[in-house]
Amino acid sequence: MRRRRAEIRQVPPDPVYGDVLVAKLINKVMWDGKKTTAQKIVYGAFDIIREKTKKDPLEVFRQAVENVKPVLEVRPRRVGGATYQVPIEVQEPRRTSLALRWIVEAARARKGRPMKEKLAEEIIAAYNNTGTAIKKKEDTHRMAEANRAFAHYRW
């Protein structure tokens, strides 16, 4: 057990859009501390989004994240030798974090093109409520719905 609650670190906004959510996406895309590379990927993806949708990439991205955010998830809870998957509501910071993680994972799973293209396609897909990240959210909600009987084990 922690002596005190871990402090929530404030992420500084990104240099181009001045947006904290974009900065968080850059941090999720980043590997081995290579932030400049991650920024090139994200800003490149935003340029592709601008070309393909003819809309503001920031608005498309924000809506995509909103579409992917899960409302419920299941957490294991041990009760008398049995482990139940208990559905619980997801807190707002975790919703955002999961949405960004799922978008980046889905983009990485796409094969055969540069990362900026894959990321742009995944964000556009999420904006249109399709794609792997949306499927992941729906699977999570389906799991929560299937285990609704154990909701009274919440803590």
Swiss-Prot record:
Name of one Pfam family that matches: Ribosomal_S7
Keywords, sorted A to Z: Ribonucleoprotein, Ribosomal protein, RNA-binding, rRNA-binding, tRNA-binding
Domain of life where this protein originates: Bacteria
GO CC terms in record: small ribosomal subunit
Statement: the UniProt record of this protein carries the keyword Magnesium: no
Signal peptide, first to last residue: none
GO terms under biological process: translation
Keyword rRNA-binding: yes
Any GO molecular function: structural constituent of ribosome
InterPro entries linked: Ribosomal_uS7, Ribosomal_uS7_bac/org-type, Ribosomal_uS7_CS, Ribosomal_uS7_dom, Ribosomal_uS7_dom_sf
Subunit architecture: Part of the 30S ribosomal subunit. Contacts proteins S9 and S11.
Function as written in the Swiss-Prot or TrEMBL entry: One of the primary rRNA binding proteins, it binds directly to 16S rRNA where it nucleates assembly of the head domain of the 30S subunit. Is located at the subunit interface close to the decoding center, probably blocks exit of the E-site tRNA.
Family: Belongs to the universal ribosomal protein uS7 family.
PANTHER family from the UniProt entry: RIBOSOMAL PROTEIN S7
Protein name from the UniProt record: Small ribosomal subunit protein uS7
Gene transcribed to yield this protein: rpsG
